[in-house]
UniProtKB/Swiss-Prot annotation:
Superkingdom of source: Bacteria
InterPro entries: SAM-dependent_MTases_sf (IPR029063)
Enzyme class per UniProt: transferase
Family listed: Belongs to the N(4)/N(6)-methyltransferase family.
GO biological process terms on file: methylation
Keywords: Methyltransferase, Transferase
EC number(s) stated in the UniProt entry for this protein: 2.1.1.-
Protein name (Swiss-Prot/TrEMBL): Putative methyltransferase HI_1523
SUPFAM superfamilies reported in the protein's UniProt record: S-adenosyl-L-methionine-dependent methyltransferases
Organism annotation: Haemophilus influenzae (strain ATCC 51907 / DSM 11121 / KW20 / Rd)
A single MF term (Gene Ontology): methyltransferase activity
Length: 296
């Protein structure tokens, strides 16, 4: 097969015929890396032969599980470990309740508040009452995406209720997540316990998408679990092969440059890494760069 056709197959996700391939996470999650999927696919297909037999792919900061799903779809014989530190798999179990609450809120606003329009105090109070009265599962990330202005994040229902509300309610139900985590081992533990278990094993790929240092982390279940010390610890634990994500809103690339110049601890792990840059936008911060670096 020509290199061009291999590239096209990677982009189009043709490796798992007759199985649904998710190109975005089933439920909202800030920073789910969907803009990088085609690049992840190309890198995996280039460096891991066939269906990945004998490989272990560890999604260390699992987030939405989208990277784990993508890896398993492309390399079905690899062992894929999804470290679900944010409880995303539990959220997927409650999509029916999430859709019921979405419909209740949608019905309250439809025809009264225009899409993206601000809610009055009276209507906001009505929506809060509907949420409080709802007996099923209440998904904070979904509520924030429906009722807060683009990209805003909160860490609690109380923080949500303190914000201005906007009609950003999704127009249709979320699809089921059937098959999303099929064949994937779901765990939940700290990265500094997880990574060392695989450090002396061959054919282990680390997928590293930590909360970005120096940025707001409210969308993560444990908002303060990744700080400067954790960042430095992660850098020292990292060894090739890996795929590592960062943003220019943090100073990750600058730090890697410093490591190379100063020959600090573990600098060789990042020597001659390759970098892919994707332009991204945020409602408040304008255009910024997301980075994917990798080394095999």
């Amino acid at each position: 097969m020509s290199e061009y056709l291999e590239y096209q197959n990677a982009i189009e996700g043709k490796t798992m015929a007759n199985k649904k391939t998710f190109k975005q996470a089933p439920l909202p999650f800030i920073g789910q890396k969907r803009m990088f999927l085609k690049h992840v696919e190309i890198v995996l297909n280039k460096h891991i032969d066939g269906e990945g037999e004998g490989w272990t792919i560890v999604d260390v900061f699992g987030g939405s599980g989208l990277l784990s799903h993508t890896a398993k779809q492309l390399k079905p014989k690899a062992t894929v470990i999804y470290n679900d530190f944010d409880g995303y798999a539990e959220r997927l179990n409650h999509i029916d309740d999430i859709n019921r609450l979405r419909q209740i809120i949608f019905n309250c606003l439809h025809g009264i508040i225009p899409k993206n329009g601000r809610l009055s105090k009276e209507i906001k109070e009505e929506i809060i009452n509907k949420i409080n009265d709802f007996k099923g599962y209440k998904d904070l990330n979904c509520l924030a995406s429906w009722l807060l202005f683009s990209g805003q994040q909160v860490g609690s229902v109380e923080a949500l209720f303190a914000k201005d509300f906007w009609n950003c309610v999704r127009q249709s139900d979320y699809p089921t997540a059937e098959g999303y985590l099929d064949g994937i081992e779901v765990i939940s533990e700290s990265f500094h316990k997880l990574i060392p278990r695989y450090q002396n094993q061959d054919k282990v790929l680390l997928l590293l998408d930590p909360p970005y240092l120096c940025t707001r982390q409210e969308s993560y279940k444990q908002a303060t679990y990744f700080d400067l010390i954790d960042f430095l610890r992660l850098i020292n634990l990292t060894k090739p092969p890996y795929i590592f994500f960062s943003s220019t809103k943090s100073e990750f690339i600058r730090y890697l440059n410093y490591m190379q110049e100063s020959k600090t601890d573990n600098w060789r792990a990042f020597e001659n890494y390759k970098r892919i840059v994707v332009k991204a936008s945020a409602s408040k911060d304008g255009i910024y760069e997301d980075n994917m670096i990798y080394k095999f």
